[in-house]
Amino acid sequence: MVMSPFAGGEPVITKSIHHDNFISEFETNLDCTDIIDYYKFISENGLTIKRHSEKGAADSQVFMHELPVEYFHDNLSRSIFRRWNYVTDQALREYVLKYDILVGRRFQHTMAKIQKTEPGQGYHAWHYESTPSAPYRKLATMIYLNDGFEGGETEFLYQHFRVTPKAGKFVIFPCDWAWTHRGNPPLNNDKYI
């Protein structure tokens, strides 16, 4: 008998929504509580970065690949990434089958960050993920780690479309300029992605 590496069983996709605009949403049963707790631990140890906009503080975040090794290679972070990658793999397989021109392409998950946005703050500038410094990016992925707040949608400019946050919701979309987007601010509680 093969034992599951996940306490409580593997995280699974419980609902998939493929929109006509190449944005896909995947609801999962991923418990994100310990990911938020891990972020808080990293923050308490002074390892988060505050991002600022012209209006002041925007959000705080941690780039997982930039953490000192003693904060990254422990049992908790391994468990978090095992589950994160498991959900990513399921969603990406489904996305690729939906858009079969992608079948046979190689995808690499090169960077992960956890981000906290406080009420009224956030990075509201329209942007897209494929930039001159990262032209290799083809698909962006995001997991909403919590809900329980008003606002906080991810808004896509040219699609006139918003994704509503829900804990465990995984989103995939193309990185090119046509999917210019922004994170709208949460209005009354912290938002974690």
Model-predicted segments: where are they?
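Fe(II)/2-oxoglutarate oxygenase catalytic core
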Residues: 1-170, 178-193
